[in-house]
């Protein structure tokens, strides 16, 4: 069966593991990016989807993600924290633009490209998931639902982890990180009519205990801990349909310390990439048994 659709979980640094896994699968002819028709992603998973839609060679993407000094793009300064009071987040759309500008420039794509035009360039149906807090529900953000929305705003909407990234407020709606209620949008993919056997999913499995807040915790540790526990209180795993092709990515709970280490340490990013390859190797062993 040909894989035509990807469903990719959010989870911060997990995106580097998923990139490693996808590349190993394509190298071993389990999946061919030329056959991908649609991608469903939340938060970091949405970023992976955008990278795939840009259609760079893997070496270019790897160098960009692993070797770029990301601590310069996401500086943690006292002023940023003070500014967050009025901006509702430490990082805003300017940071999102810094992340993607070199890539879009290399493809001669405008920073203001909207979802409709981005679809015409990639010919891949990209669905990003965001949580709207006023109506308190998940929104599918794509060229079908928001054709004139800029790609940068769409990324901010799905990656707007409260406090860290400013929410997007438009049309009396306030959009934050889709992982708050839909970290793995598998059901949305299936319900849109996609054949389950043509879907490849990348799903998180957390392998460590959630860190408790204590007297040494920072305000960001406190907030991230609260957000993760809020997410798991509305865990939808038991409602998700089962698919034949699903890669389980072992992951650590996101803490501010892990966030900083991933941004600042090339070796940490390399290890995450290698972990993704190892995950893909295990999947291939099982895949060959059932195909």
Task: Spell out what each predicted region is.
Residues 1-42, 47-291:
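Patatin-like phospholipase
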